[in-house]
């Protein structure tokens, strides 16, 4: 399993829509990049200059929204993930 370092979070990104609400099939260039996904793994948190560790605000299983062009896409054991910094996560979805 992927184990992120520091304040990084591993996210399994939600699938993008293949069709519009009206049923029109979208070309791959016309699709919006998904901005939501499920947290798969979290790092231990950011360490401040004084040595204090800032705890992570998200946990495994959370559904989160993140900034559109953030993170690094990786493929691990045939599954695509996004690794982002905690600061790029903008909300949790309940």
Swiss-Prot record:
Signal sequence extent: none
InterPro entries: Chaperonin_GroES, Chaperonin_GroES_sf, Chaprnonin_Cpn10_CS, GroES-like_sf
Pfam families: Cpn10
Compartments reported by the entry: Cytoplasm
SMART domains in UniProt: Cpn10
GO MF assignments: ATP binding; metal ion binding; protein folding chaperone; protein-folding chaperone binding; unfolded protein binding
Any one of the GO CC terms: cytoplasm
Regions annotated as coiled coil: none
BP GO terms, sorted: chaperone cofactor-dependent protein refolding
UniProt keyword list: Chaperone, Cytoplasm
Membership in a protein family: Belongs to the GroES chaperonin family.
Function: Together with the chaperonin GroEL, plays an essential role in assisting protein folding. The GroEL-GroES system forms a nano-cage that allows encapsulation of the non-native substrate proteins and provides a physical environment optimized to promote and accelerate protein folding. GroES binds to the apical surface of the GroEL ring, thereby capping the opening of the GroEL channel.
HAMAP family: CH10 (MF_00580)
Assembly behavior: Heptamer of 7 subunits arranged in a ring. Interacts with the chaperonin GroEL.
Protein name as it appears in the record: Co-chaperonin GroES
Species: Enterococcus faecalis (strain ATCC 700802 / V583)
């Amino acid at each position: 399993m992927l184990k992120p370092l520091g304040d990084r979070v591993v996210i399994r990104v939600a699938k993008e829509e293949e069709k519009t609400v009206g049923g029109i099939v979208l070309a791959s260039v016309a699709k919006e990049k998904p901005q939501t996904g499920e947290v798969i793994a979290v790092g231990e948190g950011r360490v401040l200059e004084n040595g204090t560790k800032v705890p992570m605000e998200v946990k495994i299983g959370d559904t989160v929204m993140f900034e559109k062009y953030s993170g690094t896409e990786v493929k691990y054991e045939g599954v695509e993930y996004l690794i982002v910094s905690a600061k790029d996560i903008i909300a949790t979805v309940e």
